[in-house]
Amino acid sequence: MANLFKQSRAKQKNKTTPSQTQTSTKGSARANAQVAGLRFKKSKQSKEHNTAQDANNNAITIQELDWMGQGVARGATMYFVEGALPGETCDIEVVSSKKKVVSAKTISIQGPSELRQPPFCPVFEACGGCQLQHIDADAALAYRDNALKIMMERQLSIGSGVWQAPLVGPRPQYRRKARLAIDARNPDNIKLGFREANSNKVVNLDTCPILVNPLSTAIGPLRNALEGYDSARHIGHISLIAGDNRAQVVIKHTKALEDALIETVDAFAKALGLDVVLENKQGRLRSVGEAQGLIMHTVDGCSISPSANDFIQINKVVNEKMINQALVWLDPRPNERIADWFSGLGNFTLPIAKKGALVQAIEGVAEMVLRAKDNAQQQGIENVEWLHLDLANKANVEASLQQGFDKVLLDPSREGALTVCHALVKALPKTIVYVSCNPSTFSRDAKVLINGGYEMEKAGVAEMFPFTHHMEMMALFTQRQQ
């Protein structure tokens, strides 16, 4: 771990041989070529960095990364610098500033970090899908994990021994669902891929190394199948989804597509073992041909069967590790009453129920509740009560929790679970496991639980989205001993 945090040796030496100087110059050139193409938010406030502290060289030195992977320089003013790595001295341009906190972008680098590496994707500099391919993946996780640990210790006053080792999966091919943007204004020259960062422009792709196969290898042939058809203009976006049994191409269209286009796409898909699903403007789904439903296996023989627009955890391996960790932390016992809030299709619900607990699954999307219930019945799981509820309605939430539960699992969206947490400190289940995709709202909600009589016993990150700013985390709360 220690060598992940060391600074570039080239910066630490005052004397270098001619060959070392040449190597360092080449390294700087490569690094500056990288940052020249990095994607940054534009701002009317952008201006050249020029403070009394560094007016002579217009540069700052990066000490660490924050949990999102931005370079951090601490001092009287704190700088968060996109595209910069620990140990690098960077010329920067300010994007925005507020009091003594500055957001900036890297203009050039004097002596690249040993952690800097060439992106493995040829369109990384343009594409908005990934943000962190310029750093060694293990080092990025180590820095970000440590930054999040420090943030939680500072904001929540958690004790030693709470922070757990990260849950890690495959890199880079990990993503089993993606939404592709399309530019078909010229049907003879269609662009299909992801959007540029902070732009509506589409980066044209043939493959994507982040996606699992056959999703990655389907992009180029899919674009070729669409080209030449005028009704391709009516396609809003295309989703690619990989189950464990099949994969799907889901085409969202605003007006009817011509039969010839559908037939050509279906022929392309069949050749690659894919199913085609059409989604009209009203959200109705129609399979082309004899498309099979998707099956995604999880743990303990459980599985979910998502529809095209259902939320799923996009990293299969990390998702299974999260479920297993939740089972260990919750320790569900036969006949215990356990509530699974924001339950979706039953990703956590079904494995918990398999342990014999009496589970109430509460979800805000009615269609997902119906599919989850049907899916559970097909697997012979009957000890779950499936409820559709407005999860932001205080009265409904409190009424549901008044039934009394031994343990609770939360897996909310990025908005968090503030209403539910306020109700939980009144209902007082003995154990709460919180799964979060937004550390900021998690910290807010955790304060409610801690102030309401709980202590954070365990917590840690799950690397659900390698090479991006996003970070998943999990925490175990238990009632504080009086």
Swiss-Prot record:
Origin species: Alteromonas mediterranea (strain DSM 17117 / CIP 110805 / LMG 28347 / Deep ecotype)
Residues annotated as signal peptide: none
Record-listed S-adenosyl-L-methionine binding positions: Q313, F342, N347, E363, D390, D411
GO molecular function annotations of the record: 4 iron, 4 sulfur cluster binding; iron ion binding; RNA binding; rRNA (uridine-C5-)-methyltransferase activity
Name the UniProt record assigns to this protein: 23S rRNA (uracil(1939)-C(5))-methyltransferase RlmD
Residue ranges occupied by any TRAM domain in the UniProt entry: 51-108
Catalytic activity: uridine(1939) in 23S rRNA + S-adenosyl-L-methionine = 5-methyluridine(1939) in 23S rRNA + S-adenosyl-L-homocysteine + H(+)
GO biological process: rRNA base methylation
Function: Catalyzes the formation of 5-methyl-uridine at position 1939 (m5U1939) in 23S rRNA.
